[in-house]
Amino acid sequence: RMTHDDKHLIMDDGTATLTYLDPTTLKPVKKVQVYDDKDAMVYINELEYSEGYIYANVWTTNLIVKIDPETGKVLAKIDLDGILSMTNSGKQVDVLNGIAIDPATKKMYVTGKYYPKLFEIKLVKKE
């Protein structure tokens, strides 16, 4: 549950807090609270840094949030409800819990505990 930018390791602890660590000493440098327009965004989990933003799964939900790393503000919510219905696997699955972004192609991949597949998704702006 860690990612990095060019300067720091960035870690979540399952709450709304992102902790920035010095990569050499592993000592905390700063903490940022993640929030949306209503309240603190708790259960932040599974971080991925890409193109100046942090993407995080919200534990036990089908949401991925796009976070401003400086302020902690949630800039977008990506709702993946229904993604499993595309598999028709009939197997028991647990929760969304995997995000990866290929830096070369900018493609996002998501999966979860006991998911039968890895999904490649394309992000589009909601109109």
Model-derived features: positions:
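Short loop/turn segments that connect beta-strands within beta-propeller blades
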Residues: D22-L26, D68-G72, K122-K126
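Blade-level signature of beta-propeller repeat domains, shared across WD40, Kelch, NHL, RCC1
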Residues: A100-E127
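Hydrophobic, well-structured mid-protein blocks that either form specific transmembrane helices
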Residues: R1-D37
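Conserved beta-strand positions in repeat-built beta-propeller and related beta-rich domains
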Residues: M11-T15, A56-T60, V110-K113
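Loop/turn-rich, solvent-exposed surfaces of beta-rich toroidal or solenoidal domains
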Residues: D39-K73
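Structural signal for beta-propeller blades
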Residues: T17-T19, N62-I64, P116-L118
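Beta-propeller fold detector
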Residues: V29-V34, L75-G82
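Beta-rich, blade/repeat-based domains predominating
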Residues: R1-H8, D12, K38-G52, L84-P103
